[in-house]
Amino acid sequence: MVFAALDPLGVPLGTAQASFGTDGIRGRVGTLLTPAFILQVGYWCGQVLPDQGPVLIGMDSRSSGAMVASALTAGLTAAGREVWTLGLCPTPAVPGLIRKLGAAGGLMVSASHNPPEDNGIKVFGADGAKLSPAKQGLIEAGLRGEAIGDKGRPTITSCGPAYQRNELLSHYRDALLASVLHQRLDGVPIVLDLCWGAATACGAEVFAALGADLTVLHGEPDGRRINVGCGSTQLEPLRRAVIERGAIMGFAFDGDADRMLALDGHGRVVDGDHVLYLWGSDLQDRQALPQQRLVATVMSNLGFERAWQQRGGVLERTPVGDQHVYAAMVESNAALGGEQSGHILSAAHGLCGDGVLTALQLATLCHGRGLSLGEWLDQSFQAFPQKLVNVRVPDLERRMGWQHCEPLQEAVLAAEAAMGEDGRVLVRASGTEPLLRVMIEAADSAAVEFWTAQLADLAEQHLNRGCV
């Protein structure tokens, strides 16, 4: 029976303006993410997720994480769901444990690479994949106060139980080691930047278990310093440590450890495109890459695409967001895909972005070939000059509707015409931050600088002054 959503929790519904972005619901704690709103999110997740099995909740190290997880637990149990909280863990641990334990779904409390004052909620279904847009829409409808199948006001007899199950993280650690067949890294000098975040739960532990000679930066959970001047968005601390310690590789993670960027021994960046090329080449050499296909996003470098084509490979591009990469990989039966930013998805390892697993794969593949990461990088490709500028556009309507700004659209067309087949223009409104991202890529670095400045200036001038 379907009932109207008439305040089943005693909390006013329909007042929060929130929706799923490219990576869940995300925002400033105390502004969007209030206890009352988070409780509603938990409740409506409980209505939408399958009825059988527990719902798992993991979290990164943010100071607000306990509040968010507690409010989600209250909402889920009010919907009659059984909740197992995992404590501090990387995001990929949640979908991995969903599949292993037969859970109904899971939620990860994290704002990924965002600053400490933000937080977010990622929702996974019973298959371990992020919820489909249709199911996300049902949760959004519930938050607006619309009828989606509410079971009525919770009662003492209808509330579900909640259990703390931190010990389950050991299954994830075991899976990480099994992913590289327990290959050894004895004495290999490696630096890890754990970002004060979720990677501190197991990152150093698994590398140490393989015998690596480790240097660990930002290696304790710290909710006030997560992502601050460190991790995959701030590589300079890792670069200094790699060079000073004479390491042959270094890995930096973001706040929830679902992505990773690497540095070679000279401090050169190994981004997601390079990881896809190197790991994909290994799979191709072993005839383990169906259709010679890799899946990447529109952000991936043109130099990567052309080099992969020269190897006889196919590069399929998707919109930005690992959920789009996931969908394309499932549809085309691809073995490997990911984003330039460092989200890498492997069909053999659960099709979920996993920074620690990717770092282990890269380290063991290099070591197994008798190469340093720099030597292997030299065998990859020469990236086209590429520049990304973030233009702050707080107004959501103007940001999402940038295509209707005639001066900006005309400049985009002019840039594309000027660069021809040797360049690309990508303008994209962020789904998680108040930013318009302007990316220019071309064989000519001067063209990159010129058109990036032109488009960024036009976006700043017009979108923040009422062009749309």
Curated annotation (Swiss-Prot):
Note on cofactor: Binds 1 Mg(2+) ion per subunit.
One Pfam assignment: PGM_PMM_II
GO cellular component: a single term: cytosol
GO biological process, any: peptidoglycan biosynthetic process
Source domain of life: Bacteria
Alphabetical list of InterPro entries matching this protein: A-D-PHexomutase_a/b/a-I (IPR005844), A-D-PHexomutase_a/b/a-I/II/III (IPR016055), A-D-PHexomutase_a/b/a-II (IPR005845), A-D-PHexomutase_a/b/a-III (IPR005846), A-D-PHexomutase_C (IPR005843), A-D-PHexomutase_C_sf (IPR036900), A-D-PHexomutase_CS (IPR016066), Alpha-D-phosphohexomutase_SF (IPR005841)
EC number(s) from the headed UniProt entry: 5.4.2.10
Post-translational modification: Activated by phosphorylation.
Active site: S112 (phosphoserine intermediate)
Molecular function terms, GO-annotated: magnesium ion binding; phosphoglucosamine mutase activity; phosphomannomutase activity
Entry keywords, A to Z: Isomerase, Magnesium, Metal-binding, Phosphoprotein
Phosphoprotein listed as a keyword: yes
Residue numbers of Phosphoserine PTMs: S112
Residues where Mg(2+) binds: S112, D254, D256, D258
Enzymatic reactions: alpha-D-glucosamine 1-phosphate = D-glucosamine 6-phosphate
Cofactor needs: Mg(2+)
Biological role: Catalyzes the conversion of glucosamine-6-phosphate to glucosamine-1-phosphate.
Family of this protein: Belongs to the phosphohexose mutase family.
Name the record gives this protein: Phosphoglucosamine mutase
Designated gene of the protein: glmM
